[in-house]
Amino acid sequence: MNTETQSTTRNANATTGKSVLIVGLDPALIDFSAPAFAAFPGMNAARVMAGLTADQERLAALGYDTRMCLTDFGETAEAVVLAQLKQKQFDCIMIGAGVRVIPTHFILFEKLINLVHEHAPHARFCFNTKPTDTAEAVQRWI
């Protein structure tokens, strides 16, 4: 299974206790030269991970308890996300642009939205537009 889960610790401030699940495609599995990813010039796996990690650290510094959940393109994605949802109650679920904006990933996006709706109906959704604006997306909602 090609997944990666990382956790950060929350700091004591106004956002302490707010938990966030960051869901996205595992960048190591993405072919950034494919036409579907032409909208993201210069992106590669290392840049995506660096952006996600930096924003995860930024959220932790703001007091959020964050967990990153990286999935494949659908073979195990639902099971991987469901496992995270069963481990913890999240206040906010962020689903990355790689899942949402690539037309071939539309069905995966739809499945993940319905999965979260069923297993975490209280959670807010937020959406980033690139790996480096995840913190802003979270802060809009919690």
Describe each PLM feature range:
Residues 2-38:
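N-terminal, charge-rich interaction modules
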Residues 38-57:
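Short catalytic helix/loop segments, enriched in acidic residues and glycine
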Residues 2, 37, 44-45, 140:
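Ser/Thr/Pro-rich, acidic low-complexity intrinsically disordered regulatory segments
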Residues 57-66:
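A generic structural motif
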Residues 79-114:
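Mid-chain, well-packed structural core segment of small domains
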Residues 74-81, 136:
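Structural motif
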Residues 67-76, 128-130:
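Short beta->alpha junction loops
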Residues 51, 108-142:
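Ser/Thr/Gly-rich flexible loops in soluble cytosolic domains mediating phosphotransfer, phosphorylation
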